[in-house]
């Protein structure tokens, strides 16, 4: 299984030429790093230089930077390249109210904000609650991709109801933080452990665009990175042995400026960090080339430069973990999708 998560910024104001340190609020990642399940890819991002959130996110989720005409998402194309004649309706799951750009395409995907409501909610008679839940979702959806997966979604409703999502206790004392992100990952863990045939899942965490009073040690960024790392760590603990066959990748549309602005915040930047976590991951290591933070090394004199294309990281996960060998169709025009260019963060 592969989990794709959309996040935003990770940065350390104490990073120097010779060393880099993480934020104190990311301490939940320390055991995963020590166990060599967690790896870092620094200075990763898109080669496109847009500073627009909308355009940058669209490029990252379509997997075609600089091309606005792409209709489907990279993760959907990846699944399309894997023949699964008896695929589960839960093959591709997104936690949220709509199918994200990443999963848009010909392969059916299911979006849900809450698996309990998805399974038992509805507007009609109690005896037909699941059917009514699906009908309500179908009528309210404005996403043509979701409309095209009606039969699959209806089957998913029936399967999920039989899994009894109301009764779930995270394993091994996994403690998910309060908030939508932690709740999303808890529900993904439920789906995976219910053996419903999940192959890929998507969750996101927003609220990172801090141009004012950012607070990397105490404040907005500290709070978000704490929630981010604690939720992922809890998810990993909750999966137990299933984590050995799981790869989690975090990504964002861009990073932030290398220096603080006049309002104690940071502005839209270029390179960012990607975290990869899982049983197959060769963790406890940092991958990629560090470009440096000296004035002459910054992109356009203000941002961390991109030295690893985000598609390199994703290509390796898709090829070596999911078994997709036709990466040219997943990332058209991207030359470094060839296995010879992999970072080799997977064992």
PLM features: residue spans?
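Feature for exported/extracytoplasmic and membrane-associated proteins, marking the mature portion
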Residues: 1-238, 273-277, 285-347
């Amino acid at each position: 299984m592969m989990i794709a998560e959309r996040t935003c910024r990770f940065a350390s104001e104490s990073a120097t030429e010779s060393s880099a340190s993480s934020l104190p609020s990311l301490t939940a990642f320390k055991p995963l790093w020590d166990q060599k399940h967690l790896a870092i890819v620094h200075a990763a991002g898109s080669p496109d230089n847009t500073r627009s959130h909308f355009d940058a996110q669209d490029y990252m989720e379509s997997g075609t930077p600089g091309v606005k005409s792409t209709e489907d998402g990279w993760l959907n194309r990846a699944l399309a390249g894997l023949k699964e004649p008896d695929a589960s309706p839960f093959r591709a799951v997104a936690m949220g109210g709509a199918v994200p750009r990443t999963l848009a395409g010909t392969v059916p995907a299911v979006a849900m904000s809450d698996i309990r409501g998805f399974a038992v909610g509805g507007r009609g008679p109690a005896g037909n609650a699941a059917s009514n839940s699906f009908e309500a979702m179908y009528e309210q959806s404005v996403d043509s991709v979701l409309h095209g997966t009606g039969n699959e979604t209806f089957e998913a409703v029936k399967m999920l109801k039989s899994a009894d999502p109301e009764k779930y206790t995270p394993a091994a004392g996994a403690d998910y933080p309060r908030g939508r992100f932690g709740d999303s990952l808890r529900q993904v863990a439920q789906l995976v452990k219910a053996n419903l045939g999940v192959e890929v899942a998507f969750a996101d965490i927003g609220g990172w665009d801090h141009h004012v009073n950012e607070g990397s040690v105490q404040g907005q960024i500290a709070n978000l990175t704490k929630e981010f790392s604690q939720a992922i760590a809890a998810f990993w603990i909750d999966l137990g042995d299933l984590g050995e066959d799981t790869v989690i990748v975090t990504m964002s549309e861009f990073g932030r400026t290398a220096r603080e602005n006049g309002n104690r915040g940071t502005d839209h930047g270029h390179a960012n960090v990607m975290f990869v976590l899982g049983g197959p991951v060769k963790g406890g290591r940092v991958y990629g080339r560090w470009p440096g933070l000296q004035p002459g090394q910054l992109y356009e004199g203000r941002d961390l430069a991109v030295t690893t294309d985000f598609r390199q990281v994703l290509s390796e996960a898709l090829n070596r973990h999911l078994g997709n060998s036709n990466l040219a169709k997943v990332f058209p025009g991207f030359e470094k999708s060839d296995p010879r260019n992999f970072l080799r963060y997977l064992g």
